[in-house]
Design a protein with these regions (language model features):
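Active-site-proximal alpha-helix that buttresses catalytic centers in soluble enzyme cores
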Residues: 1-246
């Protein structure tokens, strides 16, 4: 109730810029993914798309699976990097619907895929649409989160060792569900595959609402690089599997 009144007008203008003849690019591309996955998996599976804040709703998608009398439901939140505010809340919303069913089938949750070979391959294929040699610098921009979210995740493991720094340099059992660590690992895998040398790229975070969000900030890094004389900066967005307002 606090964010919407201040952002609605600006968001409406931005949506007009990305809207397509087919409609919302997020819905259009997500539907295409659903169709492609159904084709890949075949008739043994039923693939449905459910969305939190637009149609088709999560409840509608699950209701269709209920009518199919499926024996197992695989929930795949389309967030490569795990965060309680995105992946976690989506799973929670799905489970609240499922708990009302008379009979609940087996439920499997795919909570993250930030380092899955198929996901990395897809990002690399997308990047190769560009001549990487033409650019001075590369920015891997992920959606930001409040710092307190990251710290709470660290506290879950009882260590409270998160320093919002070098602790994200390597994935371990104590940070495998840390959003920031997931993002840095995605970047490491991509730059390795794309042969981008050290010093030519940076992992950044966008869409902050205040100065207590995880750093570095995408817009500030791009401004700094421009001041340093970089004239062609290529920005990747590995946190989003479908085009959207972000």
């Amino acid at each position: 109730g606090i964010i919407v009144p201040f952002r609605a007008s600006n968001s409406a203008k931005l949506y007009k810029q990305i809207w397509t003849a087919e409609g919302s690019p997020l819905l259009v591309n997500s539907t295409k993914m659903k169709i492609a996955l159904q084709k890949e998996l075949g008739d043994e599976y039923v693939v449905e798309l459910g969305m939190r804040y637009q149609s088709p709703s999560l409840e509608t998608a699950l209701d269709k699976l209920k009518k199919e009398q499926v024996s197992e439901i695989i929930i795949l939140p389309l967030y490569p990097q795990y965060a309680s505010s995105s992946t976690g809340s989506s799973v929670e919303a799905a489970m609240k619907i499922l708990e009302k069913w008379e009979v609940t089938p087996s439920v499997k949750i795919i909570s993250k895929f930030y380092d899955h070979p198929g996901y990395i391959d897809a990002c690399v294929a997308r990047a190769k649409n560009y001549n990487l040699q033409d650019y001075d610098y590369y920015v891997f921009s992920y959606h930001g989160l409040p710092e307190r979210h990251i710290m709470k995740g660290s506290a879950h493991y009882g260590a409270n060792t998160c320093k919002l720094g070098s602790c994200c340099d390597v994935i371990t059992s104590s940070n495998e569900y840390c959003y920031r660590a997931n993002c840095f690992e995605t970047t490491r895998q991509l730059v390795k595959r794309l042969n981008i040398p050290e010093g030519k790229y940076e992992t950044t975070f966008q869409s902050r609402l205040n100065d207590k969000w995880i750093k570095p900030y995408s817009d500030k890094v791009i401004e700094r690089k421009a001041q340093e004389g970089k004239r062609k900066v290529l920005v990747f967005s590995p946190a989003f599997v479908a085009d959207c307002l972000e």
